[in-house]
Regions:
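Short FAD-binding loop at a beta-strand-to-alpha-helix junction that anchors the flavin cofactor
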Residues: 3, 7, 11, 71-88
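A conserved short coil-to-beta-strand element within the FAD-binding core of flavoproteins
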Residues: 3-4, 8-28
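Generic recognition of stable, solvent-exposed alpha-helical segments in well-folded globular domains
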Residues: 12, 20, 33, 37, ...
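Core beta-strand elements of the Rossmann-like FAD/NAD(P) dinucleotide-binding domain
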Residues: 26-37, 41
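Detector for glycine-centered tight turns/loop "hinges" at secondary-structure junctions
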Residues: 30, 58-59, 154
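Flavin (primarily FAD) binding-site architecture
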Residues: 40-57, 79
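Adenosine ribonucleotide-centric catalytic and binding domains
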Residues: 54-68
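C-terminal, flexible cofactor-proximal segment of oxidoreductases
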Residues: 67-68, 79-191
Length: 191
């Protein structure tokens, strides 16, 4: 595969298929790809937390009403963390940053005898723009993989237009944010 790609006789195209033609595929961009053989694939569908029904105190949790905090947890949801990957950078870089932050957070909770941490919107945050998670990642113009297009309603996460609710895809920015103080005006600790 890579030998053929380097030779210049093959290329990679990101587009959507408009229809199958006598000679191959007509793409929505208007380009036609010649093909002797077309292999179809169903792809996969993203699921948030494996479609687990999350509850807080017996009440169902509507994740579409939460905002992502520092790219790792959610507003008004206690003690729930996840690693949201970068789109163009190694997942392990993000895992390393989040792991270090969580170790600091758990050590802080142990030292302060707190059992729960939960980011809460500040009064000024209620006026911020609510940006769907995948729009926050890809913006409006980048071509997206099909599984991202299909994920819209399955991944109801939102980010905001300001720190710490703004979603980043930048390792250096995440490193700076996650190296900051554990206690801030957003994270609430309770016993």
């Amino acid at each position: 595969f890579f030998k053929v790609l380097r030779s210049g006789t093959a290329s990679i195209v990101t587009d959507k298929i408009d229809r199958i033609t006598d000679h191959g595929l007509l793409l929505e961009s208007g380009d036609e790809l010649s093909a002797d053989l077309i292999v179809t694939a169903t792809g996969f569908n993203l699921q948030l937390f494996g479609e687990i029904d999350l509850c807080i105190d017996g009440r169902p949790l509507d994740m579409s009403r939460t905002f992502i905090y520092k790219n790792l947890c959610f507003s008004d949801v206690p003690n729930l963390f996840c690693v949201l990957p970068y789109d163009k950078t190694s997942y392990t870089l993000k895992i390393d940053l989040v792991s270090k932050y969580l170790c600091r957070l758990f050590n802080h909770m142990s030292k302060t005898a707190t059992r729960q941490c939960m980011p809460c919107l500040r009064e000024s945050d209620y006026e911020m723009e609510s940006i769907p998670y995948f729009k926050g990642i890809f913006g409006g113009s980048d071509p997206k993989p099909g599984y991202i297009d299909r994920a819209g309603d399955n991944i109801p996460l939102r980010c905001g237009d300001r720190h710490p609710w703004r979603f980043t895809m930048n390792y250096d920015e995440d490193k700076r944010i996650l190296a900051g103080p554990i206690e801030d005006e957003v994270m609430r600790f309770t016993t």
